[in-house]
Amino acid sequence: MITTEVLPASRWRDPRDLPAVLELPATGVLIGADRQQKPVALPAIGPGPTRLGVLGDHRIATLLAYRLLGVGCRLTVTTADPARWRRLLAAAGDRAVVGPSALGWPAAGPRGAEPQLLVTDLPAAPPVGLGDQPMCTVLHVATAVPTGSPYWSDVDGVLLAGHGYGTPLARLLNRPDAGELDQLSPGQLGLLDRERAVVVTPILAEAELALLTD
């Protein structure tokens, strides 16, 4: 769980402390630093669709969405509880819409030429073909690893907070290295993409801390 009430300086770093951030690829979203203090980015926007998952704390999705708004994404949130996303929606302003379903996403016309982000916390995972076009990113937030889900069986990346998610991911994705993410210390996140499993210490700016405080 991301804890924002008390944030030890030794765990949560300021972006200005990491000069190598400038070397990150344009399609990656900075998450934080690994155990060697190297920047870690999550692939999030590409020439094809990107499918992501978040496990354990919806505020991870808030952070990702906020950073993707900063690189020009238009945001759609599908949820049964819009209040859960109120701070993110307020920050996004007219670049965000919220509703109970993803009907009509991704946008067509001039808006469809911009990067499109769909964040959903609905119990059912999105259809695997949703947003199957360039610069479309889908992010599903779940409290447990959805077994038997075609979407989750083909995710490009997962961020997780808390204990016990690594082993189910290892089974679902045939990724034994995901088991290394079962035991995260307070203030840490686990990142699993198609190439690696890594423990990450998040890097948060002051504005992001305020955004993540309930």
Predicted features along the sequence, with ranges:
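Extended, compositionally biased accessory segments flanking or bridging domains
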Residues: 1-98, 194-214
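Conserved GTP-binding G-domain of TRAFAC-class P-loop NTPases and closely related GTPase folds
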Residues: 166-214
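ATP/nucleotide-binding catalytic cores
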Residues: 49-184
